[in-house]
């Protein structure tokens, strides 16, 4: 990890990815994709700050952006819901706004912004830890059924979703051309 400031870090592979994107004429795709991920994490940061949590660092990885908090423990369910939903809801709102704008200004950049926000919203709402949907689902299950039952249910849900993704990957390899990005998700 390369330390940019006391709270900002960039993985060296992220820089290599950016350089490859620039030289292969995909700089806009890289910028929009990382912009969408940064928007998501900025929403979590705003929510965390609003409920009294402090930031440790923001790190840019080749696969995304990560916000790490100093004091992750959230005392009540309402604050946990706010923290977990902030990022996905901002992505959902950005997707709806960009879709509306795309209906007027048909640019590939607006289309990509819409697709990236929609994909990040859907992916992050999957009930699998450490995704936002998984953290929220586990916290809700813990609230109603206790920690042990919640952990067991989350293991089952995670296994089912992983099996579904592997099945989808096998199906796509069998029926269509090989899609390495789907394989990476599994």
Language-model segments: which ranges?
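Hydrophobic transmembrane alpha-helices and their immediate loop junctions
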Residues: 1-186
């Amino acid at each position: 990890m390369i330390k940019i400031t006391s709270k900002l870090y960039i993985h060296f592979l992220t820089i290599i990815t950016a350089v490859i994107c620039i030289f292969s004429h995909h700089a806009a795709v890289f910028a929009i994709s990382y912009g969408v991920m940064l928007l998501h994490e900025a929403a979590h940061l705003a929510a965390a700050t609003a409920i009294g949590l402090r930031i440790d660092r923001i790190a840019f990885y080749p696969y995304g952006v990560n916000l790490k908090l100093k004091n992750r423990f959230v005392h009540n369910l309402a604050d946990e819901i706010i923290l977990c939903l902030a990022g996905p809801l901002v992505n959902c709102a950005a997707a709806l706004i960009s879709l509306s704008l795309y209906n007027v200004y048909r640019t590939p950049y607006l289309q990509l912004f819409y697709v990236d926000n929609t994909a990040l919203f859907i992916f992050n709402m999957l009930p699998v830890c450490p995704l936002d949907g998984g953290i929220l689902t586990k916290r809700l299950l813990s609230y109603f059924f206790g920690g042990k039952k919640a952990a067991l249910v989350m293991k089952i849900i995670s296994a089912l979703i992983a099996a579904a993704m592997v099945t989808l990957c096998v199906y796509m390899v069998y029926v269509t051309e090989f899609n390495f990005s789907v394989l990476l998700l599994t």
